[in-house]
Amino acid sequence: MVSQTVVSSLLVVLGAAGVRAQQRQSLWGQCGGSGWSGPTLCVDGAWCNPQNQWYHQCIPGSGPTTAQPQVPTTTARPTTTLVTSVVSSTTSPSGPVVTNPPVNPGTCPNTPSGLGTPVANQLNDPFTFHNGNKVTSKADWACRQREISELLQRYELGTLPPKPSSVTASFSGSTLSISVSEGGKSISFTVSINNRPSGAGPHPAIINFGTFGASLPVPAGVATINFNNDDIAQQQGGSSRGRGKFYDLYGSSHSAGALTAWAWGVSRIVDALELTQAQTGIDPTRLGVTGCSRNGKGAIVAGALEPRIALTLPQESGAGGSGCWRIATWQKNNGQNVQDSTQIVQENVWFSPNFNSYVNNVNQLPFDHHLLAGLIAPRALYVMENVDMEWLGKISTYGCMGIARKQWEALGALDNFGYSQVGGNSHCSFPSSQQGSELNAFIEKFLLKRSGGNTNIFRSTQTHSSFNLNNWSPWAVPSLN
């Protein structure tokens, strides 16, 4: 016979479980995902949207009637041969390609082979070389950028190959066809150029990564270039490592992760636009790049590794994009459900396999993603983040980009940097009422070359009182001349 005490205890447990089951998560709150123990039902007027395996979010509406693919496919376009130009063969240098900033770096110090001294509870000093020397001039900064790029490629991103020996391009209708040859191998891919402005060109354009989350409103006078980045490097989980046209050309065991392969693809698009400017009417010196979520990670890496990009526009890129590994780890250690380095390498193949050796102790890395953003400085960067999606690491992106901003400050270029973190919108749904004027100001200034609008922006609609920017960046900010 079961005692009354046992029955009472069982009823208490069942009652508690029932309360949890009946609890409803508020709008924009988390409602599921791997390891989630909180409410799985949403308040009336919202439904639980599975953003990914680890994070489900309550968003407005009643939900789709049928399952929607998260990463849509792109129909292949026919290749045409209206105009063809060929880049002359060049000797490919060994080692990673580094960003070529506008300042002549002169003779830069060699990058040491070791990781250096671990940095904990703060971010690496942008203005100190790996060997301990200080950055005191813009020429020094150019050398420091080269060093940062090499370190990122060595330990996280994988090697960016040099410009191939041959790039050919042709344009017909709205299709730009690109063929690349290197080492006896060749690949071809296409991009579509849409909304080309009428009238005398050349005109600016924004390269858009994929179609997933492609929600940025592009004003008149700016063309859009749709880039199927999955064609260059797949991102369908761990099994897609080494798959895509980049790896067809360089081998499936190449060290580059998908983000680096996509940046290489963007560089080839720029090459092709330089070759076909008379046919496309696109100005290759006035190019932006954008993407959201996973493709936002690709956008910021492309802006960092390709110096011909004038305006970088990552949207809700979170961890692996505008967020810093160290700050995400700090958030995770404080009980917040954010994506960190240990999880992200399990989800997909965005990074080099080399990165796996460091994800359990990111303090040993000689960089963080404030330095990835710094590879763009003083070129224009406008970062858009979503304060309602905790998985993105709202403190991580706020802190990381707030500290990244100091690099533009040192260069006297704060008008070229923007960070805007708002809420009340679904993941990758652009909140025009809150960020539309900011986005337009950046496009007007850096692509259309017209004045007007504020482009010195650092704001969040939420107060991050638990995080102190200065504590995480205790180093001095020089004035570089």
From Swiss-Prot:
One Pfam family, short name: GCE_fung
Any one GO MF annotation of this record: cellulose binding
Transmembrane segments: none
InterPro entries linked to this entry: AB_hydrolase_fold, CBD_sf, Cellulose-bd_dom_fun, GCE-like_dom
SS bond partners: 108-143, 292-428, 324-400
Top class in the EC scheme: hydrolase
One GO cellular component, as annotated: extracellular region
Key words of the record: Disulfide bond, Hydrolase, Lignin degradation, Secreted, Serine esterase, Signal
Reaction(s) this enzyme catalyzes, per UniProt: a 4-O-methyl-alpha-D-glucuronosyl ester derivative + H2O = 4-O-methyl-alpha-D-glucuronate derivative + an alcohol + H(+)
GO biological process, one term: lignin catabolic process
Signal peptide interval: 1-21
Domain CBM1: 23-59
EC number(s) stated in the UniProt entry for this protein: 3.1.1.117
Segments carrying motif GXSYXG catalytic site motif: 291-296
Intracellular or extracellular location(s): Secreted
Record-annotated active site: 293, 427
Chain residues that bind substrate: 297, 339, 347, 391
Sequence similarity: Belongs to the carbohydrate esterase 15 (CE15) family.
Biological role stated in the UniProt entry: Glucuronoyl esterase which may play a significant role in biomass degradation, as it is considered to disconnect hemicellulose from lignin through the hydrolysis of the ester bond between 4-O-methyl-D-glucuronic acid residues of glucuronoxylans and aromatic alcohols of lignin.
Protein name in UniProt: 4-O-methyl-glucuronoyl methylesterase
